[in-house]
Amino acid sequence: MIKTGIIGADTLPAAELLRILVNHPEVDITLLYAPELTGRQVSSVHHGFIGEDIINFSNMADPSALDVIFITDDSEYGRNLIDNRQKFPETRIIDLSPGRFQNWSSLDMEYGLSELNRKSLVRGAKYAIIPTEVASLSLIGFSPLAHYLLLGGDLTIEVAAPADLVDTIDTVALGDEIERQLRNLQTSFTGKVRIKIEPNKSQRVMRIRGLIGCNLSLEEISKIYENIYDDHNFTFMSYSPVEGREVEGTQKCIISYRKPDASTLEIEVIGDCRLRGGAGDAVHVLNLLFSLHEKTGLYLKPSRYGHTRESTSRSLSWFA
């Protein structure tokens, strides 16, 4: 079993993480670090845990006794763990703290997006930083085009996100994060990535959308995306936009594409932003670091679903 600790266990990202880890067959939750809540039960802070056999919150932590540590807050303790990680060389660290990209350039940590860096995460990586929510979906949508050297000029990405996230997103830093990863794939890409954000009606679902100049046919575009994602377990393609309930509560990410005209390609990506760029990506990285199957612990049931009659025809709202 993988002895697992969470720093900042009282945070909302930690709650999402716990809801996955409690059912992960290879994980032993050994530490829930939240000093101000020492001795309290998880169910007194996070809902959905009544009846679950989980340890209480604690203010005592021994990193060397853990196989992996998730950092979910910006506490001084979490930062010190990263700065002094050589003192416990056998412990892996996965950083999904809010301020994780402030000093990333000076850290030896893999960018924790499987769709980009699966090989490096599997082949000996010990430290990973989880992409932000918008970056996770945006890179899944546009990185195949960078792989095939199809990006040119500036890229504007429109984002429809849950209202509580809109004011927390630093669009400049986010643009820099996405640009850096795209340029790693296509060095000739010198454009700027600009982010436009507006709230949607969902509490969990995020959509991103962007237009690029592209003369390829839909069939050619489809082959590109299938070549890139054919052996990935959570990323799928669709010729038409999909409803939020297809992804809500799951690790799935669905890409749709269309040609508004012969020289333009529209890419749209939808995912659960509490999991993508958060707890779901973090557990996905955990599986890779420990050479587990990618889907271990991530067979998640959609949290919103229903029946759609075949005869029903309606356009999907960008804000759905």
Model-inferred region functions:
Residues 209-320:
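C-terminal active-site/capping subdomain that shapes the small-molecule cofactor and substrate pocket
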Residues 16, 20, 140, 144, ...:
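Alpha-helical scaffold segments in soluble metabolic enzymes
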Residues 1-172, 187-191, 258-261, 295-296, ...:
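N-terminal Rossmann-like NAD(P) cofactor-binding subdomain of oxidoreductases
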